Amino acid sequence: MAVSSCQSIMSNSMTNISSRSRVNQFTNIPSVYIPTLRRNVSLKVRSMAEGEPKEQSKVAVDPTTPTASTPTPQPAYTRPPKMSTKFSDLMAFSGPAPERINGRLAMIGFVAAMGVEIAKGQGLSEQLSGGGVAWFLGTSVLLSLASLIPFFQGVSVESKSKSIMSSDAEFWNGRIAMLGLVALAFTEFVKGTSLV
């Protein structure tokens, strides 16, 4: 609609402009339908202030000394608060570490569980009972410490985020892997055998 009206305006040449005063020159619509902008000549503006206007006292200001009434300029850019490196802050319920660590462990655990299940045909419960608990605990401690070291140095996950390997992608992949592990365990429990 807007394109066609612009094209019709542009296609009309200046020679086709009519000299009629009751018709809009560009759209050929009678001016009865288009609101006009008329000036109200009788409009007067007056002040509603009470009393006499007060004159400001003139005080000589020395240009070398700053006045007390001038505000101090605030910097335009303020740094974000630095991330806390205390263990209790990192591992708090809303801290940066717990969900990252659990997500990373779930990603490794889901891939490892599915790999063993495809290769050997063992379910998740068989993997844990056949010596998998020691591997699980060792891997969990190692990856948890490896995830905590950058946090203790004050490095946030978002500062090291890149376009493809972004922190949001890791966050969502970890959540999906956690759901995948729970779904794998639940499916094997209901089914009674391994998934594959």
From Swiss-Prot:
UniProt entry keywords in alphabetical sequence: Chloroplast, Membrane, Plastid, Transit peptide, Transmembrane, Transmembrane helix
Pfam families for this protein: Chloroa_b-bind
This protein's record includes keyword tRNA processing: no
Subcellular location: Plastid, Chloroplast membrane
Function (record text): Probably involved in the integration of pigments into the mature pigment-protein complexes.
UniProt membrane topology term: Multi-pass membrane protein
Positions of the UniProt region annotated as Disordered: 47-81
UniProt record similarity statement: Belongs to the ELIP/psbS family.
Gene Ontology CC annotations of this record: chloroplast membrane
Basic and acidic residues: compositionally biased ranges: 47-57
Transmembrane intervals: 105-125, 132-152, 176-196
Chief location bin: plastid
Protein name stated in the entry: Early light-induced protein, chloroplastic
Induction behaviour: By light.
Transit peptide, start-end: 1-48
The keyword Glycosyltransferase belongs to this UniProt entry's keyword annotation: no
PANTHER family given in the database record: UPF0041 BRAIN PROTEIN 44-RELATED
